[in-house]
Amino acid sequence: MKPKVIVIVGPTASGKTSLSIELAKKINGEIVSCDSMQIYKDMDIGSAKPTEEEMQGIKHYIVDEVLPTERFSVARYKQEAETAIEEILQKGKTPIVVGGTGLYANSLIYGIEYNDIKLDEKYREELMNIANTPEGLEKLYEKAKKIDETAMEKISFTDKKRIIRILEIYKATGKNKTEQEKESRKNEVKYDYKVFAINIERPILYERINKRVDIMIEQGLIEEVKKLIKKYPEFPTAMQAIGYKEIVEYLNDELTKEEAIEKIKQETRRYAKRQITWFKRIENIKWLNGLDETQNNIKIILEVMN
């Protein structure tokens, strides 16, 4: 029998962190992060990284892993996450995978082997330059749509990073991302993943998101971005993240402070909507009510696990 691994996904601001920490305390678990921004060092406020205090002594893996100047592929994530899961199981503890990055979650749940594709940096630069011109991103979006319509259904027309990624993969391999995923799903899945998703009524979730953004600003998000720019003048991938790119636009006088804050809220709400759509496609997923008592959701998780 394959070892069981708990996976908790959900949109941003749905309460994944607090639920997972309470669960870990109850069942002697450790947490494997499934978040493409919390892997970066020095990007704490904007990525809603749990603080030492919030972690309550529970060990977290794949957090503060790389510098914002480094690229971190899905292939690398899968490898590191499986190593962490194995390490947790060896200790006789329960692994709990937690986060909102659908691509990371899928790589584990479906055993998708994303080969570490050697990308053409020059071509990426070319695409970045086009994306930064008026209507350039729109043109790239249309081009990517012709290459891989299925993958583009899940990608927003403003998501520069992922649009460019679709084009890069095709240029490097001659195959689109969807074809590659189909081929790579033939692998045996290592563990018995029990997947739970947190659901919250849209208006309440959006209210939480707006509030969270205000708190991030109060906590010093603008200062965090200033420090990042000073410390890492070249960190294009990390800077495409929601909450960071808008503050950069504000610091470059492209937006007022109020406009930047409003844009972060709007982009985060859109992202949450895409996350929910993504998680709905996961087979055998068990939905939890995010407004329920934490202990009640823990009870539901444990019933499925036993």
PLM features per residue range, with description:
Residues M1-N306:
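Phosphate/pyrophosphate-binding catalytic cores of soluble transferases and nucleic-acid-acting enzymes
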